[in-house]
């Protein structure tokens, strides 16, 4: 067993670390991480810092596939184990490996009925760990809504984030009735909630078998924003704006839009209903669609068509805005119909 040398010392966001009160080790299961990539290292460090018993981590054989943990500091004080040692010492085994490797790695572990098999993928279904369930183990998905490209930063910014959790109980356990109903009554979900809160995360319980939809939705709120920024920059390039000025102007605009959405959600939370949970976001929309400014919308569409650009994308985004504005009651029926009619002129034929 090896231990990386210098412990990681949080500097980028020490206030978040101070907000977490370490929980006595006996209150949590013993956990081990199979895989020492960015997610595994970040979570192992966060759990260890919070007082959760992290018994060790497993990394691939360094002769065939070196794992770059030297100098990272996130795994300092956490023993490196063999796969056999991890299975013997841990109650929860976290498979923090690439999605395509989850099933293969799960098949190589000597599972027992006291184990909980965990993966951190957003889209991969829990059935990828079927071999663990066949051995009597419970399955759990634990997907922090967090960016792990910079692990040291990720450790410090975990507090305040949400985590998507899905559970498939062991064969001997009662069947899961529904994500929210079981959230307060199932011991396994209570344990998962306690672990999440130990590192400052708030759970979102996912309906079984719907991870792909959950992950696609998260993608809209994350990387899809980057695609929209790129599309905006492409239009600006045609408008003659210097490339070095584009992101300097667009990124603050995007940040202010997110801030407006947060404010609208907080101010109009009482308007949200089960049938229209995102209605408050309609109050954050600005621009010609929000004003029902038909002339401007038509000029936008004409310009895009003239330059052979993506009119369908503009229409699709505008139609989503119309739906939100309608749910929020921000436009009259007459205004909504006028915007829809303007968009329909450019519908594919």
Model-derived features: positions:
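Rossmann-like NAD(P)(H) cofactor-binding subdomain of soluble oxidoreductases
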Residues: 72-154, 179
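Internal alpha-helical scaffold of NAD(P)-dependent oxidoreductase catalytic cores
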Residues: 43, 66-75, 153-268, 272-277
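Short, basic/aromatic-enriched C-terminal tail that caps enzymatic domains
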Residues: 146, 331-349
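Phosphate-coordination loops involved in phosphoryl transfer and adenosine-cofactor binding
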Residues: 28-30, 114, 160
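NAD(P)+-binding Rossmann beta1-loop-alpha1 motif at the extreme N-terminus of oxidoreductases
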Residues: 2-85
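Interdomain hinge/lid region at the active-site interface
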Residues: 262-268, 274-334
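Short, well-ordered alpha-helices that flank and scaffold nucleotide-derived cofactor binding pockets
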Residues: 41, 45, 49, 107, ...
